[in-house]
């Protein structure tokens, strides 16, 4: 890609290691397309956005002017990448304002069934709007006829601490796996293993990725508990691989990867 890349709501740390030349072509935008906080904006957006044609000035009601204007500065040859875009009407309203010749991508880094109520129907609608869709999960890619884009990881430049301070490390939102995580933690501690489990209630309460990697590096083993019906790799197996850590995972699909080693990877079946 020779033009600019406008990235919406993606984790910034993934792109921080790019060369200055590539960084100059990236425009980072926060998740300004997310659900409004006030009841009035929630109701009016549900009733109007994407259902009738609305000019940009009206869309400012729901989407912050600064960021919408930035995204719509894209020109032919540029590209837009939206993480987890799932509201069909919002994507429809935005797409109608994007100049022709701008490629629009959406990347799903969570299982599709956790993102959509009607996955097949909604994904087809989004594709018909002109968005190119991809997912981290190979089964979802096959099931919904979208592109598969494997998991990614950027190895940081920071030094790795020498001595681990815990045996097992997990950090992530509970989602639908809190009972499984609690049971595993109790099992590990019963077997005299020290656990460092960080489970914030919301994403805003979580630690930074730099701190996350520091905590991971201070542990001997990484815990990887996937959501139900997930086959795509999370970033944890890659982090364990690059940091030379053991891994406990419930993702059976990991055994098909060439880096799988049964001596250091424990599958919870």
PLM regions and their residue ranges:
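Nucleotide-sugar donor-binding catalytic core of glycosyltransferases
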Residues: 1-75, 83-93, 108-238, 246-259
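Glycine-centered loop/turn motifs
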Residues: 77, 262-263
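Short acidic catalytic loops
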Residues: 80
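A short helix->loop->beta-strand "cap" motif at the edges of active sites that frequently abuts
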Residues: 99-104, 131, 243-245
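Conserved acidic donor-binding segment of nucleotide-sugar-dependent glycosyltransferases
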Residues: 264-269
């Amino acid at each position: 890609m020779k033009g600019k890349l406008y990235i919406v709501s993606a984790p910034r740390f993934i792109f921080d290691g790019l060369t200055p030349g590539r960084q100059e072509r990236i425009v980072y935008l926060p998740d300004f397309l997310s659900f409004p906080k006030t009841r009035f904006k929630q109701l009016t957006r549900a009733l109007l956005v994407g259902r009738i044609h609305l000019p940009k000035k009206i869309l400012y009601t729901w989407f912050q002017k600064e960021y919408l204007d930035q995204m719509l500065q894209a020109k032919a040859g540029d590209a837009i990448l939206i993480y987890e875009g799932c509201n069909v009407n919002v994507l429809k309203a935005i797409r109608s304002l994007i100049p022709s010749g701008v490629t629009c991508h959406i990347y799903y880094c969570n299982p599709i069934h956790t993102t959509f109520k009607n996955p097949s129907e909604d994904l087809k609608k989004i594709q018909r709007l002109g968005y190119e869709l991809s997912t981290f999960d190979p089964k979802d890619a096959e099931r919904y006829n979208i592109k598969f884009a494997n998991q990614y990881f950027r190895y940081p430049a920071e030094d790795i601490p020498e001595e681990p301070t815990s045996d097992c490390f997990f950090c992530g939102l509970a989602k639908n796996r809190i009972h499984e995580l609690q049971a595993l933690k109790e099992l590990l501690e019963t077997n005299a293993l020290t656990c460092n489990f960080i489970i914030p209630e919301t994403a805003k309460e979580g630690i930074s990725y730099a701190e996350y990697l520091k905590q991971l590096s201070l542990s001997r083993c990484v815990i990887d508990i996937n959501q139900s019906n997930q086959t795509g790799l999370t970033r944890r197996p890659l982090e364990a691989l690059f940091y030379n850590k053991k891994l406990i995972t419930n993702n059976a699909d990991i055994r098909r990867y060439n880096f799988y080693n049964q001596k250091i990877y424990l599958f919870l079946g």
